[in-house]
Amino acid sequence: MLKVEERYTNAVPELQKFFNYGNIMQVPKLVKVVINTGVGEAVSNSKAMETAEADIVAIAGQHPVVTRAKRSVANFKLRAGMPIGLKVTLRGQRMYDFLNKLFFITLPRVRDFQGVPNTAFDERGNYTLGFKDHSVFPEIDFNKIEKPRGLEICIVTTANTPEEGKKLLELLGMPFSKD
């Protein structure tokens, strides 16, 4: 099985031919992968942020940045500046290692997995994938989970259209649904 990096070197000529690029620098490539999660219960339970951080470190292999509330919301007992989430940006080799794990280990572990939806592209060819439960990642011990936590994975590319981004991710091994 080829890794994502090796698949990219094989995909460059195919993308150049498919989209009729005149210059090899026009071929879309991966820029970064951003993993983020909201920890809303951190307002009332300070330990929730620590456990979420430990889970993100296990999944990404890198310490996350704490995201804070921009403004106060009285209904949620939230004040501006309070920690409400975590995010990690992966680039370079860590990005490729994470995508290998995501495409070939994690996604096949999802129950009743039929492929990722084709509709999650933005207008610039970036793809966002959401998980309702982070326990599908092999680094997370299912017995130690206090509460299932959702997270988002945003794959940022240099593609200009959703079609370019889809073709790039398809050639890299992203399992899209058939419909």
Swiss-Prot record:
Keywords: Ribonucleoprotein, Ribosomal protein, RNA-binding, rRNA-binding, tRNA-binding
Claim: Methyltransferase is one of the keywords in the record: no
Record bears the keyword Cytoplasm: no
Domain of life: Bacteria
A matching Pfam family: Ribosomal_L5_C
InterPro entries registered for this protein in UniProt: Ribosomal_uL5, Ribosomal_uL5_bac-type, Ribosomal_uL5_C, Ribosomal_uL5_CS, Ribosomal_uL5_dom_sf, Ribosomal_uL5_N
Listed transmembrane segments: none
Example GO BP: translation
GO cellular component, one term: ribosome
MF-aspect GO terms: rRNA binding; structural constituent of ribosome; tRNA binding
Subunit-level organization: Part of the 50S ribosomal subunit; part of the 5S rRNA/L5/L18/L25 subcomplex. Contacts the 5S rRNA and the P site tRNA. Forms a bridge to the 30S subunit in the 70S ribosome.
The protein's role, per its UniProt record: This is one of the proteins that bind and probably mediate the attachment of the 5S RNA into the large ribosomal subunit, where it forms part of the central protuberance. In the 70S ribosome it contacts protein S13 of the 30S subunit (bridge B1b), connecting the 2 subunits; this bridge is implicated in subunit movement. Contacts the P site tRNA; the 5S rRNA and some of its associated proteins might help stabilize positioning of ribosome-bound tRNAs.
UniProt record similarity statement: Belongs to the universal ribosomal protein uL5 family.
Record's protein name: Large ribosomal subunit protein uL5
Organism the protein comes from: Dehalococcoides mccartyi (strain ATCC BAA-2100 / JCM 16839 / KCTC 5957 / BAV1)
Gene that encodes the chain: rplE
